[in-house]
């Protein structure tokens, strides 16, 4: 072997050794990065943002109580249907107790509790062009009335109070049935109808756009809101914690400030089950 060949082979060996060392360093760095990423990701999973499916009438108040969750607001009946179809979520807060109870019986949510209450009012456009002064004026021919569909809480409550008032006949003046209370409120505020039945709490949020007409207290049906952890929740601990925030003094204070009330016998803590 000539000196030139020997030097050439030596140079090749050095290059191979250097390349191997570089690959080893790169592999070690990759493992380090993977482990570091796993260490960062682990707490993120245990404190993942929960998803709360909540009645439209809770749109303004829930973020005041807890800003952390991802909220989806809609008609309670629509949200219950989503849960039945397997929508990924952690908490269900409805504008009645019927839907949470039905889902509990179906094994889709944990045992629900009542966390707040509301009452019904009649609203007209701010200018009140139909000159409606009481719920009994809705008997007049030609009145354009908005109500919720019979399957959503606001629609069910509306039909109950009308039955209590012996006014079920005014449903003949209904020009549209809506899927949630915010739709009723929005259309009345825009003057698309002469009147509509909504919750007091929703009416308070747009007092500059609607006129509120009180309904007889004796005819009011119990309007109670139920909440429960969804069985398919991937973060039950935070879901339970959220519900306990609703039941805690601060949560109840904020609900009261928004116009909600605390019914007798309300739970003070939630454990599910």
At which residue positions do the language-model features occur?
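N-terminal secretory signal peptides that target proteins for export/translocation
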Residues: 1-13
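Generic detector of short alpha-helix boundary/capping microenvironments
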Residues: 6, 15, 110, 214-215
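Generic low-complexity segments that are intrinsically disordered, proline-rich and/or Lys/Arg-biased
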Residues: 7, 24, 43-44
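Alpha-helical transmembrane segments of integral membrane proteins
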Residues: 13-17, 51
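Bacterial N-terminal signal peptides
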Residues: 19-36
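Exported/periplasmic ABC-transporter solute-binding proteins
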Residues: 35-66, 70-72, 77, 81-85, ...
């Amino acid at each position: 072997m000539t000196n030139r060949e020997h030097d050439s082979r030596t140079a090749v060996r050095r290059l191979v050794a250097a390349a191997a060392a570089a690959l080893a360093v790169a592999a070690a760095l990759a493992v380090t990065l993977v482990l570091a990423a796993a260490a960062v990701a682990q707490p993120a999973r245990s404190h993942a943002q929960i998803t709360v499916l909540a009645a439209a009438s809770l749109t303004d108040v829930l973020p005041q109580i807890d800003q952390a969750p991802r909220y989806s607001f809609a008609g309670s009946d629509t949200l219950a249907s989503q849960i039945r179809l397997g929508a990924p979520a952690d908490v269900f807060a409805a504008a009645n107790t019927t839907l949470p109870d039905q889902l509990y019986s179906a094994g889709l949510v944990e045992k629900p509790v009542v966390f707040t209450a509301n009452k019904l009012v009649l609203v007209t456009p701010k200018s009140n062009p139909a000159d409606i002064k009481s719920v009994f004026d809705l008997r007049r021919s030609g009145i354009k009335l908005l109500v919720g569909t019979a399957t959503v809480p606001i629609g069910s409550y509306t039909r109950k109070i009308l039955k209590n008032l012996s006014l079920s006949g005014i449903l003949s003046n209904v020009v549209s049935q809506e899927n949630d209370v915010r739709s009723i409120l929005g259309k009345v505020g825009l003057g698309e109808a002469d009147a509509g039945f909504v919750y007091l709490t929703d009416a308070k949020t747009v007092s500059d756009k609607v006129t509120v007409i009180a309904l007889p207290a004796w005819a009011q049906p119990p309007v109670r809101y139920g909440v429960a952890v969804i069985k398919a929740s991937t973060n039950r601990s935070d879901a339970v914690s959220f519900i306990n925030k609703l039941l805690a003094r601060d949560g109840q204070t904020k609900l009261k400030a928004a116009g909600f009330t605390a019914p007798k016998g309300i739970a003070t803590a939630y454990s599910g089950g």
